[in-house]
Structure formats: C-alpha cells, structure tokens
C-alpha cells in the first residue's frame, strides 16, 4: 500500500483501512510523502479516533515533521480541541516550539485549546 492511500485514509478517518494497512507491517512512525508521519495527518484533520488508534500502536506523540511541527502543534493550528486533549493526555510536550518559534499555547487561537495548554 502506498503513501497516498494511507494518507487518504488518515485524513478521511477511514480507521478500518488504516488498521488493514498497519496489519501488513507498516511502521506507524514512518515518514510519509510530504515529510509527515501518520499522526500528523490525523491531528491536522481532526481525526480523534485515528489518533487514539495510532497512539495505541506506538506512534511517537512528539515526533516532528520535516518542518519541526509536532502533532500537538498541527492539532492546535487547525483548532481541533479533542485532538489537542488526546495528545496532551498521551504525553505531548506542550512547550515544544514550532518553526515560527511559538509554543502551542502561543499559537492557539481557540480559548478552549488555550485552557487545555495552560
């Protein structure tokens, strides 16, 4: 299964397809096309159930993408409150800064996300 199929399934919340792909010995922490890991795509697209699954399979909660953006920053930038909550509960480093030099709290526009990050 290629990166495009996996990325589509991650972005669209097709958990059954992601499980099917990962059963075939896919590395949950591998870097996909575009320099991001599966967890980044799930966080960026607000796929909370997908995040839970990937984390249960050993996804690195603090893995940076090719730009130095973590899954927590991805979820924060896109305003996905539930994803931010899950990532924090699973040990995401809320003090890591993105390439713009801002932490998740500093980058957050959502008051609900800021409250979680305090």
Curated annotation (Swiss-Prot):
It is found in: Cytoplasm; Nucleus; Cytoplasm, Perinuclear region. The keyword Repeat applies. One of its GO terms (biological process) is regulation of barbed-end actin filament capping. Belongs to the myotrophin family. ANK repeats lie at residues 1-30, 34-65, 67-98. InterPro entries: Ankyrin_rpt, Ankyrin_rpt-contain_sf. This is Myotrophin. Regulates NF-kappa-B transcription factor activity. Promotes growth of cardiomyocytes, but not cardiomyocyte proliferation. Promotes cardiac muscle hypertrophy. Plays a role in the regulation of the growth of actin filaments. Inhibits the activity of the F-actin-capping protein complex. Keywords: ANK repeat, Cytoplasm, Nucleus, Repeat. Pfam families: Ank_2 (PF12796). GO terms for cellular component: cytoplasm; nucleus; perinuclear region of cytoplasm. It comes from the Eukaryota. It comes from Danio rerio (Zebrafish).
């Amino acid at each position: 299964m290629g990166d495009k199929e996996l990325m589509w399934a991650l972005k669209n919340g097709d958990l059954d397809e992601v499980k099917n792909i990962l059963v075939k010995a896919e590395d949950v922490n591998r870097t996909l096309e575009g320099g991001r890991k599966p967890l980044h795509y799930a966080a960026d697209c607000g796929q909370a159930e997908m995040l839970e699954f990937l984390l249960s399979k050993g996804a690195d909660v603090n893995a940076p993408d090719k730009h130095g953006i973590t899954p927590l920053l991805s979820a924060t930038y896109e305003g996905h409150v539930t994803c931010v909550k899950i990532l924090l509960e699973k040990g995401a480093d809320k003090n890591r800064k993105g390439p713009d030099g801002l932490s998740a709290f500093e980058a957050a526009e959502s008051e609900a996300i800021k409250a979680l990050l305090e």
